[in-house]
């Protein structure tokens, strides 16, 4: 089956909510992953390790500008 425009799996970028909220000057932790739009229609939020905060934080999905 060909992957077209309506492919259920899309790439998403997860960004640390703690770094964004606290305006950390060192940087912002980002992860790239995939999600299935049919199973997860809402924005994705995962607990992942942030090297700038030095602990596990919630990383939320951000919008990709193309």
Swiss-Prot record:
What's in the GO CC field? chloroplast; ribonucleoprotein complex; ribosome
Cellular location of this protein? Plastid, Chloroplast
Q: Which domain of life is it from?
A: Eukaryota
Q: Name one GO molecular function term.
A: structural constituent of ribosome
Keywords attached to this entry: Chloroplast, Plastid, Ribonucleoprotein, Ribosomal protein
PROSITE patterns to which the protein is assigned, alphabetical: RIBOSOMAL_L33 (PS00582)
Q: Name one GO biological process term.
A: translation
Enumerate the HAMAP family for this protein.
Answer: Ribosomal_bL33
| Similarity comment text for this entry | Belongs to the bacterial ribosomal protein bL33 family.
Q: What is this protein called?
A: Large ribosomal subunit protein bL33c
Organism for this UniProt entry: Jasminum nudiflorum (Winter jasmine)
Lineage in the entry?
Answer: Eukaryota, Viridiplantae, Streptophyta, Embryophyta, Tracheophyta
- Name of the gene this protein is made from: rpl33
